[in-house]
Amino acid sequence: MEHGARLSTSRVMAIAFIFMSVLIVLSLSVNVIQGVNNYRLQNEQRTAVTPMAFNAPFAVSQNSADASYLQQMALSFIALRLNVSSETVDASHQALLQYIRPGAQNQMKVILAEEAKRIKNDNVNSAFFQTSVRVWPQYGRVEIRGVLKTWIGDSKPFTDIKHYILILKRENGVTWLDNFGETDDEKK
């Protein structure tokens, strides 16, 4: 009888040990899955927003944005840089500089200061009218084509076809303008 009781106790202990081991493995796997989900919720959760000046809602997360958001931001940056007069150029360029990374602001300040000086000296007014917009959200790239009308003093407007490429990055909930460049268009 001692022999049978001892085997029965060993079996119960073995089954209990296996059961506890299975519970520990399940608990660890659930904790890992929960940790991954928490990370994704914290960094990849998208918020849908509809701004005042635009009709199309957009979605943003901590480190990414959809095509609609990138398009609207790029059009806002274009307006801040190109829809200016001698009275508004300083305020517009100052607002644009807030979206440039702090390390690149000095270079952009020089470019914008030269533009502002020419605009003020020649009493220039300009307006940009977009004709097409293409967005690549995975790269943060926005290409905008349009017509730039420029008035110098009281003259008739000069019309130029322009093609701009803007690179936008979204990091830690902040949108940065990495590049604001003009490219030559072969279709002129």
Curated annotation (Swiss-Prot):
A Pfam cross-reference name: TraE
* Keywords recorded for this protein, A-Z: Conjugation, Plasmid
Ribonucleoprotein recorded as keyword? no
Which cysteines form disulfides? Answer: none
Superkingdom of origin: Bacteria
Q: Could you tell me what this protein does?
A: Involved in F pilus assembly.
Q: Hey, which family's this protein in?
A: Belongs to the TraE family.
Q: What is this protein called?
A: Protein TraE
- This chain is encoded by the gene named traE
